[in-house]
């Protein structure tokens, strides 16, 4: 076997396999070149998903006629000289055009403002023809035909025309978000599929461009980010936890204007939402990271989708801290999608018929009416005085907030008093009723609010546990009779590796034979809890955490699990004072729009929406 030099054309085809995987990659490379050329208008036309035809036109600075041959030659570029660590352009390798020309039919027409005429050059399967004079306006036009006709085997890996067109559209959207001052147009040979008008190149302009791409729901559900550490600045938008998706396609990250899809950045975003979102949902966020070029390596892969930071800890800390602070400062702010889903669930009821009223009439005629028989309580009922509670609704004597209260029996509580204007001015308003033993109905000056009492109190207890834990270990209470919990040997061994972490929460466990755990102490803050259920829930998740590397994650999960077991349960009736106290605590504590599992704690329905349901507006 003889070692020999590969031909330039074969080298370009190999390089094309790294840079050009599908038509969307061709569009990406050509659009990035247009942006680097200072274009303010970029038009893309495709046919058959870009497999047969791609045309990218721009009004950038153009390429001089005497440099066109260099432009389609490998490793020829005007964007860098000898400092590969100080890259300020999207493209810099000089590989895109020669790679495309080696596997397709490429035609490039360009004109600079100094030139009287444009010039044209063609590359077919690596063979260069031209340059020669042509007619064109200022800027560059690149046409690509019959992609991969040199390597037809690659076409077998292409998806349908629709799928490839969607990939091109997604690629343009991802780039367009970072450059709101550029007008983008995407069309087929017969119709325009996307038109993004230019906006101001500032925060407001970015939000307008994002709204063009993400839809009108984005703006009311997003929070602006602006944070800085050392030489790194983070801007962008993070959406409310309840405004989430079932995949990560709505997460966008840009490093010095370059769109990247980096798992490290996705992990940082995930970590920022860890306390407020379920694991099977994904936050919506758009991040712009600006830092000195020497602090980031964009030359990790030819596709330039991955980057490597010199100080990844600084970047992660900045992202997590900025998003969490923004979420905490957002206050009581329900997502618009909840109320819209709620409105969609309402239906105009069918007229009551004699048949539908039959059972009710029979029941009514067979018994006399009384408030108690219909499970209603009056505001004049005599109750025991409320026990003193701390700011989180947890009693100082470590009994849960609602334990031992003399609450009426029934399905609902409806107070007869009318709330004052001061009570209605609170963000979550004044409690007006409790229905189905779990939902608090509150009234504000211009809306109706429904609160899930268990989810809301779970978040309050969770925040209390975290604050208390990081201040000092939680006090525990000895069980009069220790409980033995039977687990599999694997689960028991895994949970016992977290014994010290659990002790910080006041949960004392020790081995008790193969697959068994003895529980001697429980957190006094939680009062009486179901020890068996708590230990089994902790064991189900403990295997995911390492005691050294992910201790904080483990502690947060333990706090969330304990909060779930120690909060107000569904089916517990509350008095007006208790309902209003819960509302005021929700207003005072951050992140109360969702519980620890990411479920919403309340839904707001505006009065205008209610009136619209009844045809009043």
Curated annotation (Swiss-Prot):
One of its GO terms (cellular component) is mismatch repair complex. This is DNA mismatch repair protein MutL. GO terms for biological process: mismatch repair. GO terms for molecular function: ATP binding; ATP hydrolysis activity; ATP-dependent DNA damage sensor activity; mismatched DNA binding. It comes from Bartonella tribocorum (strain CIP 105476 / IBS 506). It comes from the Bacteria. Keywords: DNA damage, DNA repair. The keyword DNA damage applies.
């Amino acid at each position: 076997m003889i070692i020999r030099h590969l031909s330039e054309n074969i080298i370009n085809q190999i390089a094309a396999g790294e840079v050009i995987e599908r038509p969307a990659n061709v569009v990406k490379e050509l659009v990035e070149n247009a942006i680097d050329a200072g274009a303010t208008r970029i038009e893309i036309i495709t046919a058959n998903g870009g497999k047969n035809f791609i045309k990218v036109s721009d009004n950038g600075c153009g390429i001089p006629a005497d440099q066109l041959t260099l432009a389609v030659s490998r490793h020829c570029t005007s964007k860098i000289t000898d400092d590969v660590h100080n890259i300020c352009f999207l493209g810099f390798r000089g590989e895109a055009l020669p790679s495309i020309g080696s596997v397709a039919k490429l035609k490039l027409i360009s004109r600079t403002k100094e030139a009287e005429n444009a010039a044209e050059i063609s590359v077919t399967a690596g063979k260069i023809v031209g340059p020669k004079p042509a007619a064109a306006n200022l800027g560059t036009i690149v046409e690509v035909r019959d992609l991969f006709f040199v390597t037809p085997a690659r076409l077998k890996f292409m998806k349908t025309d629709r799928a490839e067109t969607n990939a091109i559209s997604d690629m343009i959207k991802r780039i367009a978000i970072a450059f709101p001052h550029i007008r983008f147009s995407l069309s087929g040979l017969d119709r325009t599929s996307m038109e993004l008008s230019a906006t101001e190149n500032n925060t407001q302009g970015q939000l307008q461009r994002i709204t063009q791409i993400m839809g009108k729901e984005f703006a009311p559900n997003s929070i602006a980010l602006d944070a800085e550490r050392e030489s790194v600045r983070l801007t962008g938008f993070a959406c409310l936890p309840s405004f989430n998706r079932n995949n990560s396609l709505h997460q966008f990250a840009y490093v010095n204007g370059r769109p990247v899809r980096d798992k490290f950045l996705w992990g940082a975003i995930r970590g920022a939402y860890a306390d407020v979102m379920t694991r099977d949902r994904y936050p919506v966020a758009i991040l712009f990271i600006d830092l000195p070029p020497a602090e980031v390596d964009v030359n990790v892969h030819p596709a330039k989708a991955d980057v490597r930071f010199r100080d990844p800890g600084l970047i992660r800390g900045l992202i997590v801290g900025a998003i969490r602070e923004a979420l905490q400062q957002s206050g009581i702010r329900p997502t618009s999608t909840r109320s819209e889903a709620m409105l969609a669930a309402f239906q105009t009821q069918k007229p009551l018929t004699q048949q539908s009223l039959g059972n009710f009439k029979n029941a009514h005629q067979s018994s006399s009416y009384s408030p108690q028989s219909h499970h209603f309580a009056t505001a004049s009922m005599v109750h025991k005085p409320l026990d003193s509670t701390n700011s989180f609704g947890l009693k100082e004597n470590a009994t849960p907030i609602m334990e031992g209260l003399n609450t009426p029996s029934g399905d609902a509580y409806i107070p007869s008093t009318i709330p004052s204007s001061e009570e209605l001015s609170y963000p979550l308003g004044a409690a007006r009723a409790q229905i189905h033993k779990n939902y608090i109905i509150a009234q504000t000056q211009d809306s109706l609010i429904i609160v899930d009492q268990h989810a809301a109190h779970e978040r309050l207890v969770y925040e209390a546990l975290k604050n208390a834990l990081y201040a000092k270990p939680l006090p525990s209470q000895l069980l009069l009779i220790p409980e033995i919990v039977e687990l599999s040997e694997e689960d028991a061994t895994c949970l016992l590796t977290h014994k010290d972490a659990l002790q910080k929460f006041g949960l004392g466990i020790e081995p008790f034979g193969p697959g068994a755990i003895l529980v001697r102490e429980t957190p006094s803050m939680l009062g009486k809890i179901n020890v068996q259920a708590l230990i089994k829930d902790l064991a189900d998740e403990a295997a995911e955490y390492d005691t050294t590397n992910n201790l904080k994650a483990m502690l947060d999960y333990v706090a969330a699990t304990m909060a779930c077991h120690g909060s107000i349960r569904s089916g517990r009736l509350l008095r007006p004072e208790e309902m209003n106290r819960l509302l005021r605590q929700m207003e005072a504590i951050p992140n109360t729009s969702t519980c620890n599992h990411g479920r919403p704690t309340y839904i707001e329905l505006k009065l205008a929406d209610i009136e619209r349901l009844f045809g009043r507006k």
